[in-house]
């Protein structure tokens, strides 16, 4: 009998544990809204999110006028819209209750208490995390989307409500079931009634306000709510996954660095500082690293977060005031304005409150201009700033407080022979003096990283040269299976070198991979020099040197002694051939399907796998290639005049390097190879 009691107790406990585990993913989202526009798309009237995962009541994302259970990458979303009823013009001005019930592995949508749709999905727990967030307007934190309407009430329940329980709910009246979170939007300030979410950050403030007991959201308006925040300090794991890089900077988490733009960079009081964008629990934040040599970095606690600024930290640059104080200019995501902040301590951990930049015309009126990726620089004693986008705007100030609108950045004499129209968007901009020119380092969202060289005329920028640093057209897409060299940032080193980074978009993990730092120089011949950072030589060990190698067609020379998945090569070809020659490396498990780096004096390009950066050898000029292999990421530098990056499908512990020639015997003066240390150990 005692045995049966114990068995019964065990079964009850086991069933209870399993039920609790299942119920962790059960929840209900409810929101009452009066729509004002059905033509907005992929906005949410209530989203719960933790990290990159979210569930939300999303409108018009897949098909105009229809509701879905929005989720990260549509993992828990039914994308079949064929049987769903669409909102019409008749829906406008009428309050609608929309609800999503997550129960077990079933998701049910309700409109005004009646079943709208249902489907099966593997639901997840988003309510057990103290640092989750809730958003209105946008699809999710770090994303976009719009809603146009008045939200009367919004709630989250930690259980799957029944049809009757949903129908019993009334806006602005307490329910018998205690909500996990509840907004009734009454009073003068936004308050979440359970006290769970004590912080509320509005975005695009003119388009969102609490008024007359409603949250009134118009296109691009948004609200993010979150509780007390534990400061985040990114940290590289002690035992990272095998495919994580060894000597490239990247974001280890929390959150993801997509975008992962390198942003304000400084050399200040003996220390280098670099910021970059990542998506924190409450939106776009600036990760902060510091280093004494630009090789070994440490993370600071992330302080530039929406909880402090009131908006997301988006693309921007660092500069110094006339007095030598570090400052940053950036786009305040969701604020509709570009912003300025000033450092308040030597470690660059404390910053002033943001100051919105509001330029005026000569008549004191606000100009018709875009507010987008900015940059700021000094010319003489005057500060100039651009606001990016198509045909960017220009402004100037004597004090960083009062800004005069100057019209367009680009001079009306913009040349027609640069190979790129002036309307090609200029974002992630960085303007600086180099040699006897002014360089505008930037991106186009279509072309990736690029640069202009030129000068100022009539207080306008007049470029006379343009070139790309990326040769994969992005077409405004983030992840497309090919590495994109994107979003540059630069700074001056202690000894006056101009050093730049760029975000390498590849769609893999970890996110926020930064390119190797590159030194830029513009000598008297006017040709930009691009070199790997000198300090990278600190990482070399186990040197191998080979000299005077003869390579014949059909008989590749293999570098059999070069091993490891983190290596640097320096290969010099004497009197290079007009025909194609070069280097094969990497490949799959069998050594096939590798990548080739191809040169030749009759070629106009340097082939690096499937990209063709412009590159020509001068008559009688030797060719020196510096090649960095970090797992499956390859960066190539040719005669300090060209550089390219490529990511391969496979990682090999033996890099499978060989030198080839197509038609004639090739002389390789010298090969140097090194293994490379990890920057994380």
Language-model features and meaning:
Residues 221-421, 427, 433-481, 502-547, ...:
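Beta-rich carbohydrate-recognition and catalytic domains
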Residues 93-102, 109, 431, 569-571, ...:
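Short tryptophan-centered beta-strand motifs in secreted/extracellular beta-sheet-rich domains
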Residues 22-37, 44-46, 54-61, 94-97, ...:
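A carbohydrate-recognition surface predominantly in extracellular/luminal proteins
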Residues 119-150, 174-180, 645-670:
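Flexible glycan-contacting loops in extracellular carbohydrate-active proteins
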